From Swiss-Prot:
Any one GO BP annotation for this protein: photosynthesis, light reaction
Annotated PANTHER family: OXYGEN-EVOLVING ENHANCER PROTEIN 1-2, CHLOROPLASTIC
Keyword Cell cycle: no
One term of GO molecular function: oxygen evolving activity
Species of the source: Spinacia oleracea
Entry function: Stabilizes the manganese cluster which is the primary site of water splitting. Binds GTP after preillumination of photosystem II core complex. This binding is inhibited by DCMU.
Family classification: Belongs to the PsbO family.
Top-level taxon: Eukaryota
Organism placement in taxonomy: Eukaryota, Viridiplantae, Streptophyta, Embryophyta, Tracheophyta
Keywords associated with the record: Chloroplast, Manganese, Membrane, Photosynthesis, Photosystem II, Plastid, Thylakoid, Transit peptide
The protein's name in its UniProt record: Oxygen-evolving enhancer protein 1, chloroplastic
InterPro entries: OMP/PagP_b-brl, PsbO
Length: 332
C-alpha cells in the first residue's frame, strides 16, 4: 500500500510542475502581448526571457515619460507664445484669410504685413500713386534721459513698454509720387495716424507720448526719404487736471490760492496756464523690399519726436522710435 502511494506521488509530481510551468508561460505570454512583445509561434516558447521583457518594459516607460515631458514643455511654450508680441510675420493675404478668433490674442493685429517673393529694392516706375494700407509698427522705443550711473550724461536709453499691443499706426493714406530721377514723395492725409504710448525708463520713470505721423511730408531717395510731421498735445484743451485747471475750460488758477496775482507766479505759471500747442517731429523711412505685381512695399523707419509735456508743465523728452512699415501703392 505504501509502495503504491509512493509510486502515485512520484507519478503526480511532474504533472503539477508541468501545469505550473504552463500557467507561468501563459501569464508571460499575456503580459508580452499587452506590451507589444511577440512570442515564438512554435512550442509556445518565448523569444526573449522574462528579464529582457521587463527591461524592455522599463525602457518603454522611460520613453513615454520623456515624450510626456516634451509635450508638456511644448504646451507651455505655445501658451507663453500666445501672450507675446506675435510669432511669424504674415503677408496681407494671410492676415485677411484669418477669422477674428484666429487672430485674437496672437498679436497679429498689432503687426504690419510682410512681402514674400519681392525684390530687395524699390521697383516701381515713375508716376503718381496713392499709398493705402500704410502701416507703421514700432519695434523699439528709446528715451533720452540722464543715466542711472553716477556722472553719466543724457543718452537714449532702452525702455520697457507699459502699453498694451495697440501702438501700431494703420490704414494711413496719401498721395505717393515717384519722379523720373528716382526720388519719391509721400504726404499723409488720413488714417489711424496717432497712438498713445507709455514707456518706462530703467530708473522707473514713466514717459507718455503720442506716437504719430500727422501731416507728414517725406521726400528723398527710396533708400532714405524723410520729413517732418505734427505732434499734437498728449492732452486736449478741455482736459482738466486734479485741481480743475484746463486749457479752454476750468479754473484759471489753482483752487484756494489767495488773490493778488500769486496764482500767476513764475513757479505756478506753467501749472496754471495750460499749453496745448503742437510740436514737431521727424521721421526717416527706407524701402527694403517691394513687389510691383501686388503694389506692396515694406521697409524700416526711425522717428524722433518729443514726449508729453503735461500741458506745458514739464520739459519734453526726446523719444526715438524704430520699427517696420508697410504700404500698398495704387497707380492713379
Amino acid at each position: 500500500m505504501a509502495a503504491s502511494l509512493q509510486a502515485s506521488t512520484t507519478f503526480l509530481q511532474p504533472t503539477k510542475v508541468a501545469s505550473r510551468n504552463t500557467l507561468q508561460l501563459r501569464s508571460t505570454q499575456n503580459v508580452c502581448k499587452a506590451f507589444g512583445v511577440e512570442s515564438a509561434s512554435s512550442g509556445g516558447r518565448l523569444s526573449l526571457s522574462l528579464q529582457s521583457d521587463l527591461k524592455e518594459l522599463a525602457n518603454k516607460c522611460v520613453d513615454a515619460t520623456k515624450l510626456a515631458g516634451l509635450a508638456l514643455a511644448t504646451s507651455a511654450l505655445i501658451a507663453s507664445g500666445a501672450n507675446a508680441e506675435g510669432g511669424k510675420r504674415l503677408t496681407y493675404d494671410e492676415i485677411q484669410s484669418k477669422t477674428y478668433l484666429e487672430v485674437k490674442g496672437t498679436g497679429t493685429a498689432n503687426q504690419c504685413p510682410t512681402v514674400e517673393g519681392g525684390v530687395d529694392s524699390f521697383a516701381f516706375k515713375p508716376g503718381k500713386y496713392t499709398a493705402k494700407k500704410f502701416c507703421l509698427e514700432p519695434t523699439k522705443f528709446a528715451v533720452k534721459a540722464e543715466g542711472i550711473s553716477k556722472n553719466s550724461g543724457p543718452d537714449f536709453q532702452n525702455t520697457k513698454l507699459m502699453t498694451r499691443l495697440t501702438y501700431t499706426l494703420d490704414e494711413i493714406e496719401g498721395p505717393f509720387e515717384v519722379s523720373s530721377d528716382g526720388t519719391v514723395k509721400f504726404e499723409e492725409k488720413d488714417g489711424i495716424d496717432y497712438a498713445a504710448v507709455t514707456v518706462q525708463l530703467p530708473g522707473g520713470e514713466r514717459v507718455p507720448f503720442l506716437f504719430t505721423i500727422k501731416q507728414l511730408v517725406a521726400s528723398g531717395k527710396p533708400e532714405s526719404f524723410s520729413g517732418d510731421f505734427l505732434v499734437p498735445s498728449y492732452r486736449g484743451s478741455s482736459f482738466l487736471d486734479p485741481k480743475g485747471r484746463g486749457g479752454s475750460t476750468g479754473y484759471d488758477n489753482a483752487v484756494a490760492l489767495p488773490a493778488g496775482g500769486r496764482g500767476d507766479e513764475e513757479e505756478l505759471q506753467k501749472e496754471n496756464n495750460k499749453n496745448v500747442a503742437s510740436s514737431k517731429g521727424t521721421i526717416t523711412l527706407s524701402v527694403t523690399s517691394s513687389k510691383p505685381e501686388t503694389g506692396e512695399v515694406i521697409g524700416v523707419f526711425q522717428s524722433l519726436q518729443p514726449s508729453d509735456t503735461d500741458l506745458g508743465a514739464k520739459v519734453p523728452k526726446d523719444v526715438k522710435i524704430e520699427g517696420v512699415w508697410y504700404a500698398q501703392l495704387e497707380q492713379q
